[in-house]
Amino acid sequence: MEVLLMKRIFALLLAAVSLISLTACAQPEAKTASKYQLADPQYPQMAPYPDETKFSRPNGDFDSDGFNQVYNAWQADRRKQTDQPEGYTDALDSYLHAVIPQLLTGGSGENKVCSPINIYMALAMLAEVTDSESREQILALLGSGDVNALRAEAAAVWNANYCDDGAVTSILANSLWLSDKISFKQEAMDALARYYYASSFRGEMGSAAFDKTLQDWIGQQTGGLLKEQASGLTMDKETILALASTIYFRAKWNGEFSEANTVPDTFHADSGDTTCDFMRQRGTNTYYWSDRFSAVSKPLE
């Protein structure tokens, strides 16, 4: 029974986390209450990113005192998010080395995209609501000694990647969906909200109304950018538990590309050559190369 249940959970887990918004222009939609909701996470409040143009006086002087006050408040909130316990990424690094090759190999010439952080959070939630051998297997994959350690590590990962200051939006949204045919412990739902910043819902699996709630949740968390993909996401009536994790990321380049330097060129793909626009920029930067690919670092603000 446990093996069958885990197969059902993982099948929907992998389908759900494939809906990922890596870059975005729209803003996340406002949350709406749902009759199905069991617990709702509270995201950190952040001071807004300082806009220098708002501190220029009519006579041309710059209000440095006012700017510094806003800047210091913003910097304190950013530091609060990024200053996580030393070594919290150790287990995450081990997980990434184990998982990424499995996710990105064997594409038969097709491009692949994945967000290992989303899968990490989904697996962490799954460990929270399972026990026995299933939990031990997940903890081993994630490199965590026990659930208490996993809670601390997952919360640190989530907070280190969270930002919502008006200039950068980076939100990992997580959720758990339960069948109304099974019982649950409210303290477990509260733990998901507290440590994994996850919403939890309970309803009739396979019903149009519950599917619509899932689709709406995906849309709200991704600024409506995945409306088409989310509209086809449904849960089978025999499903007991489903997990969904999205990432909404929006930021500016540290140095924007000049449109005048964008020119058509040849892109060499496995399927053949094609002509497309290439953004070009000159400068000193970090460059990585290997036998099979090369990459360049491009910082964001």
Identify the residue ranges that each predicted region occupies.
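Sec-dependent signal peptide hydrophobic core
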Residues: 10-17
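Hydrophobic core
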Residues: 18-22
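Detector for small/aliphatic-rich hydrophobic stretches
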Residues: 3-5, 10, 25-204
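Non-catalytic, conformational "gating/processing" segments within enzyme and secreted inhibitor domains
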Residues: 50-53, 109-110, 114, 119, ...
